[in-house]
Amino acid sequence: MKGVKKTYDISYTLSFLLVFFVLILFRPAFSINTLSSTESLTISSNRTLVSPGNVFELGFFKTTSSSRWYLGIWYKKFPYRTYVWVANRDNPLSNDIGTLKISGNNLVLLDHSNKSVWSTNVTRGNERSPVVAELLDNGNFVMRDSNSNNASQFLWQSFDYPTDTLLPEMKLGYDLKTGLNRFLTSWRSSDDPSSGDYSYKLELRRLPEFYLSSGSFRLHRSGPWNGFRISGIPEDQKLSYMVYNFTENSEEAAYTFLMTNNSFYSRLTISSTGYFERLTWAPSSVVWNVFWSSPNHQCDMYRMCGPYSYCDVNTSPVCNCIQGFRPKNRQQWDLRIPTSGCIRRTRLSCSGDGFTRMKNMKLPETTMAIVHRSIGLKECEKRCLSDCNCTAFANADIRNRGTGCVIWTGELEDIRTYFADGQDLYVRLAAADLV
C-alpha cells in the first residue's frame, strides 16, 4: 500500500506541475480584458486584452510594410485583421520595445527609452481607489476607478477619440458640455495608420450637418437629420438589423447607431482614398461588404451644380435649373461647367409670390437656414411668405407626416434629387413662374 501511495503522490505532483507550467506558458492566450495599475502590456510579451465577447482585441501591431509599432484595437475573430482604433497613430514606436501601463492615474505608452509617446492625459484630484483600464464588449477601451463600472463615470474612453472608424454605440459629433468634437480622420494609406488627408466632421449650425473634407476642401455634405436618418445618405435606412439616432440638445449634438442582431456587425469608416462607407459582416461573410459608399456619384459631390440648381443622376447633363430659374452663364452651362448655377427668370415681388413643390430632394445647405421646431408646414409657409428674404421652406422632421419648419433666407446650394428617399422642398417663385 505504501508503494501505491508513493506512486499516487508522484503522479499527483507531476500533474500539478504540468498544469502549473501550462498556465504560465499559455497565460497570454486567456481572455483577459482588464489592465490593473500593477500590470503592463509589452510588445515582447505578446499579451493582449480581449473583450468579454471575444469580438475585439487590444494590443501592439505593425503594418506589413513598416517596422514601426502601434497600440490599437481590431476585430479578433475575423479572418482578415481589421483595425478600428489606433492610440499612437502619429507617434509610432520606432522599434519592438514598447510598454503600456497605468502611471499617475493615466494610461501611458512608453518607448525603448522610457519616454511617453502617448497618454490619456487626464487631470484628476485625489483618488480614493486604484485606476483600471478595460476593453469593453463594444470595443470601447476605458479607464475607470476599480470600484465603479458606471459609464458616466469613465475617466477616459477611446470612443471619445476615434480614428477612422465609428462602431455601434460610438458617438460622432459634439459633447457640448466639454466642447469635444468627435470626428473621423482617414489613414494616410491602407498600410499607414497616421492621420490622412480626409475627415468626416459635424458642423454646428441651426441644423447640424456632417462634411467629408480634404483639408479645407469640402467633398460631400451629409444633409441634416430628418428624424429617420441623415438625409443625404438614404441607403442607411435599409438595414433592418440596425437603428440610428441623432441627439441634439443642450448637452450634445451627435449621431450614433446600434445593432439589434448580434449575429451581424457593421461599422462606418472613412477610407484613405476619401470615401465614407458603411461596411457590414453577416454570419456567412468571408469579407466585409461595402453596403454603401459616398461620394458614389457626381451628384454626391459638394455643390456640384451651383446655386438654385439641382443634381439628378437620371438626366444628362446631371445639373438642372430649378423651375423658374435659368443658367446664370449659358456658355459655361452648355460646356457642362455648372458651378455658376442658375438665376431667377422673374424677380420676386414679395407680396404675390408662391411656391413650387420639389419632391424627393436632399435639402439645401443649412448655412442660411432658420429652424422652428414647434410649428407645422402651414405655419412654416406663412412665415416664409411674410419674410421677403425667404427663398424656400421644408419640414425639419419627416416623421408623423412632417413636423417642424426650416426656412432658407439665402441662395439654395448643394441640392439633389433621389428616386424615392428624399423629402419635399418648397421653393419660392414669382407668380409669373408658377405653373
From Swiss-Prot:
PROSITE patterns assigned to the protein according to its UniProt record, in alphabetical order: BULB_LECTIN, PAN
Secretion signal, residue range per the UniProt entry: 1-31
Keywords assigned by UniProt, alphabetized: Disulfide bond, Glycoprotein, Self-incompatibility, Signal
Pfam families reported in the protein's UniProt record: B_lectin, PAN_2, S_locus_glycop
Cystine bridges: C380-C405, C388-C390
BP-aspect Gene Ontology terms: rejection of self pollen
Tissue expr: Stigma.
Positions glycosylated per UniProt: N46, N114, N121, N150, N245, N261, N389
Domain PAN: 350-430
Domain Bulb-type lectin span(s) in chain numbering: 34-156
Role description: Involved in sporophytic self-incompatibility system (the inability of flowering plants to achieve self-fertilization).
PANTHER family per record: BULB-TYPE LECTIN DOMAIN-CONTAINING PROTEIN, INACTIVE G-TYPE LECTIN S-RECEPTOR-LIKE SERINE_THREONINE-PROTEIN KINASE SRK-RELATED
UniProt-recorded name of the protein: S-locus-specific glycoprotein S13
Organism: Brassica oleracea
